[in-house]
Design a protein with these regions (language model features):
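Iron-sulfur cluster-binding cysteine motifs and their immediate structural context
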Residues: 268-269, 290-325, 334-349
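Short gly/pro/ser/thr-enriched loop/turn and capping motifs at secondary-structure boundaries
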Residues: 4, 28-30, 48-51, 118-120, ...
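General beta-strand structural signal in soluble alpha/beta enzymes
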Residues: 22-24, 41-44, 71-74, 93, ...
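Thiamine diphosphate
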Residues: 122-259, 267-271
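Glycine/aspartate-rich loop-and-adjacent alpha/beta segment that forms the canonical ThDP
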Residues: 248-304
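Terminal amphipathic helices with adjacent charged low-complexity linkers/tails
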Residues: 1-74, 260, 345-349
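Active-site diphosphate/adenylate-binding microenvironment
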Residues: 75-139, 148-151
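Gly-rich Lys/Arg/Thr-decorated short loops/hinges at beta-loop-alpha junctions or inter-strand turns
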Residues: 78-88, 119-128, 195-205, 224-229, ...
Length: 349
């Protein structure tokens, strides 16, 4: 979505063409705004569906008659979509959200999530998010569930939301949780950027939307300012330490906040996220791997499974082994920490 509308750019475009087609999903937002500027849109929602997701074939089917003046003829389908390999959306290799949600799953917490990359934690094998309604609803949901259902209803409860979501609509429900004596734990995932929707700045990055240095709002000070007495920080890449801090905070009879640190978005180049990792990539020791698949539980895209009954060097049976793609691995060491058999080691050239 482009807003504010680039009116000069649109005007320059209209001067170069004879007809304009506006293709957008759902409501005719851009189309309406362009018409309000006084321009004529030949094809828009009068031909293109206003519901559902658009695809090249749907757009072509919708515009063939008004643009080309002939009926649309569907091409022969060579490959059916259901026959294509499935590739569900996933967190990036090395993403700090992955070990955090792995820790939450290990602790068996009921997690109220929010809107961001971390919403992918709802899917297996992580399956570590149980509710996600709308932006900013995580903290209110966790606090409200604790008040209405009680501690015996859902068990230990926590809310998880990203840094930009916290500034957008997370402060108010945190105030409510403190004011109304809630006891839920809020985890703020500070990855230094608005990651999912385009790498925009926010009040916690230290830069304006024009990339100018500005005041960086401190999460810890803000949480304490609204009355949260228990605020702690964790490095999510240190799985056991993170689990211990979360375990302590969810057992408090008061609202608490945990902030992740040293965990910038893996795509945020200015933060140099890869410099903290000791090795550029890791590999599986085929002699030690038992094929237990525990490491696959973090759902890292750099890891895959090689099927095939086999024996380890010391005679243990296994159904296969895990493989690590060195071109995708960034060396975050999360898999190293959870492997019981020390079968993951720094890669060599």
């Amino acid at each position: 979505m482009v807003w504010p509308l680039p009116k000069k750019l649109i005007a320059a475009f209209f001067r170069k063409v004879k007809k304009v087609i506006v293709v957008e999903e759902l409501d005719p937002f851009l189309e309406t705004e362009i018409k309000a500027m006084g321009y004529k849109v030949q094809c828009g929602k009068n031909f293109i569906p206003a519901i559902g997701e658009l695809s090249p074939s749907i757009v072509k089917q919708s515009l063939t008659k008004p643009v080309e003046g002939k009926r649309y003829q569907a091409p022969k389908v060579r490959i059916k979509s259901e026959d294509l390999p499935r590739r569900p959306p996933n967190l990036c290799a090395g993403c700090a959200h992955r070990p955090l949600f792995y820790a939450l799953k290990r602790l068996g917490l009921y997690v109220f999530g929010d809107i961001g990359c971390y919403a992918l934690a709802v899917a297996p094998p992580l399956s570590a998010m149980h509710a996600s309604t709308c932006m900013g609803a995580g903290i209110g949901g966790a606090y409200g569930a604790g008040k209405v259902i009680g501690k015996d209803g859902l068990g230990k409860i926590c809310a998880v939301l990203g840094d930009s979501t916290f500034f957008h609509s997370g402060v108010t429900p945190l105030v409510d949780a403190v004011y109304n004596k809630g006891y839920s734990t809020t985890i703020i995932l500070d990855n230094g950027i608005t990651a999912m929707t385009g790498q925009q700045e926010h009040p916690g990055t230290g830069y304006t939307v024009h990339s100018e240095p500005t005041t960086m709002i401190d999460y810890e000070q803000l949480a304490k300012a609204v009355g949260v007495k228990h605020v702690r920080k964790v490095d999510p890449y240190k799985v056991n330490e993170t689990m211990e801090v979360i375990r302590e905070e969810v057992n408090r009879d008061a609202a608490s906040v945990i902030i992740t640190e040293n965990s910038p978005c893996i795509l945020l180049r200015r933060a140099k996220p890869l410099e903290k990792f000791k090795s550029p990539w890791y590999a599986i020791d085929a002699e030690k791997c038992r094929g237990c698949k525990v490491c696959l539980g973090i759902n890292c895209p750099a890891m895959s499974w090689l099927e095939g009954a086999d024996l380890t060097k010391d005679g243990h049976k296994r159904k296969g082994i895990v493989l690590i793609n060195k071109d995708q691995c960034v060396g975050c060491e999360v898999c190293v920490q959870i492997c019981k058999f020390e079968a993951i080691m720094p890669g060599t050239k």
